[in-house]
C-alpha cells in the first residue's frame, strides 16, 4: 500500500514484513484452533470426529488444512508506484513479480513451520473498502483507488487481488489475455467473473463460449454472473430493475458481490460503487 518507495527495494521489504505478520497470526490461530478441537469439551465435535484419522496420522486435527494469505489492490499499487495499471506491460510485470515473490515466501513458511500455506485471491469484500478508506485519510492527495484518485473519491475501494478494474474493458477476451498468466500463479482459490446485464437464454451459445475459453486459456476458474431482480409480487425478473416493470414496486437487485449472490442494497458503499462501474460482457458472449 506504499505510495512512495520503488518496488525493488522498500516495497518488497514492506510486503515481506506484512506477510511475516500474517504468518505469525495464522500460526497462532492454528494452535488455538487445535486446542479448541482437542479439548475434552470440544467446540468442534463434528469436525473432531470427521478429522479423527488425520489426528491419528499426524497427531493434529488440522494438519491437512492450509493457512491462506491473499492480497488486494495490485492494480492500484502499480498506479501508486509506477504510474501505470496492470493492463500495461510494465504494470503486468510488476504484478507477476509480486505474486512470484509471495509464492516463494510461502514456500519458505511451509519449510519453517511444517504447515501448508497457499496464495489466494481472497474475496475481501470488506477489506477492499476499509483499507481504501484508511489510505484516503492517510494520503488524500495521491492515493490511487479503483474508482479515482485521492480525497475527491466519495466511496473509495481497491480492486480484488490482482484483478483489473471492473470497467477496464467490455471485451472478455481482452480481459482474459491480460489476466490469464496472473490467474495461474495462485495456489489457492481464484476466479474471474464475467458480469452480464441479464441471463443468457441460449445454452448452446454459453456452451460454445465455455469451450472456447477452456481450450485457449489456462485460468482455473471463471463464472458468468447475470444480474436479476426480485419483486415481492411478481418474483424473478431478468436483469437489473430497481422497480418492477409490472407493478412499479421496489425490487431487490441481486448480483455477485465477489463470491456470493446478495442483494446489491446490502453491499457496503465501496462495493456498491464498484457495481455501478461494472462493464457487462453480454455482446461478446452472444457473438460466439
Spans of features found by a protein language model:
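Acidic, glycine-enriched catalytic cores built around paired aspartates
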Residues: 15-72, 76-287
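Short, small-residue-biased leader/transition segments that mark boundaries at the very start
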Residues: 3-10
